[in-house]
Amino acid sequence: MCPLRSLLLISTLVLLHHLPHLSLGRSLPTTTASPGRSCLDYSQNLLRAVSNTLQKARQTLEFYSCTSEEIDHEDITKDKTSTVEACLPLELATNESCLASRETSFITNGRCLASGKTSFMTTLCLRSIYEDLKMYHVEFQAMNAKLLMDPKRQVFLDQNMLAAIAELMQALNFDSETVPQKPSLEELDFYKTKVKLCILLHAFRIRAVTIDRMMSYLSSS
């Protein structure tokens, strides 16, 4: 019989993947990181940071259609990463009977697993998460540069969120090519930039929930 924990995880991942209109305004419980922080600690910190940033943006940009019901949902990782598929529990991804044994473990450099050993499928999952974080980090940095040019200085990104992304990426510790930031040649439109900020924050919070669920599953496995 399939482990109940695995079934609950896959149900959550599929729900988050197919319901982008999921309510995003709920407050999150405060957690205390244990000594020698794990990727679960970092993912929880990231989820709090992006939730706080989104809440502030919705309050500041209340006249910019910044609620989940009003925005046009967009996934910048579409066709570039496959986190939901890569992060399926191994017993569900490799064998419908859920009796498949774990693949041979090997050494990884990241701090996400205390032993430093993980299966091939888990490594694919963590790498996909890393690639997601990298893409969003680049997008947010480029967008923040535009927002800082706005004479109104109405809204800009919380540095705590950018730091939380960088911390989790560092903990995952995958080698990856640097994503070049291509400067936009179009005329700056601060209204469109602020609407785009809302779209990215909503999408990233959904991805942060998925990442946190996966880290929780891995830490309890």
Swiss-Prot record:
The cross-references to Gene3D superfamilies, in alphabetical order and at most eight, read:
1.20.1250.10
Q: Name one Pfam family in it.
A: IL12
Which GO CC terms are listed, alphabetically? extracellular space
Its Gene Ontology biological processes? immune response; positive regulation of biosynthetic process
Listed disulfide bonds for this chain? 39-112, 66-198, 87-125
Residues annotated as glycosylated are: 95
Where it mainly occurs, coarsely classed, is secreted
Give the molecular function GO annotations.
Answer: cytokine activity; growth factor activity; interleukin-12 receptor binding
Keyword Metal-binding recorded: no
Instruction: Enumerate the subcellular locations listed in this protein's record, separating them with semicolons.
Output: Secreted
Q: Does the keyword Glycoprotein apply?
A: yes
Please describe what this protein does: Heterodimerizes with IL12B to form the IL-12 cytokine or with EBI3/IL27B to form the IL-35 cytokine. IL-12 is primarily produced by professional antigen-presenting cells (APCs) such as B-cells and dendritic cells (DCs) as well as macrophages and granulocytes and regulates T-cell and natural killer-cell responses, induces the production of interferon-gamma (IFN-gamma), favors the differentiation of T-helper 1 (Th1) cells and is an important link between innate resistance and adaptive immunity.
Question: Which protein is depicted?
Answer: Interleukin-12 subunit alpha
Which range is the signal sequence, renumbered to this chain? Answer: 1-25
Family assignment from sequence similarity: Belongs to the IL-6 superfamily.
Q: Which PANTHER family match?
A: INTERLEUKIN-12 SUBUNIT ALPHA, INTERLEUKIN-12 SUBUNIT BETA-RELATED
- What does the annotation say about its assembly with partners? Heterodimer with IL12B; disulfide-linked. This heterodimer is known as interleukin IL-12. Heterodimer with EBI3/IL27B; not disulfide-linked. This heterodimer is known as interleukin IL-35. Interacts with NBR1; this interaction promotes IL-12 secretion.
Keywords (A to Z) from UniProt: Cytokine, Disulfide bond, Glycoprotein, Growth factor, Secreted, Signal
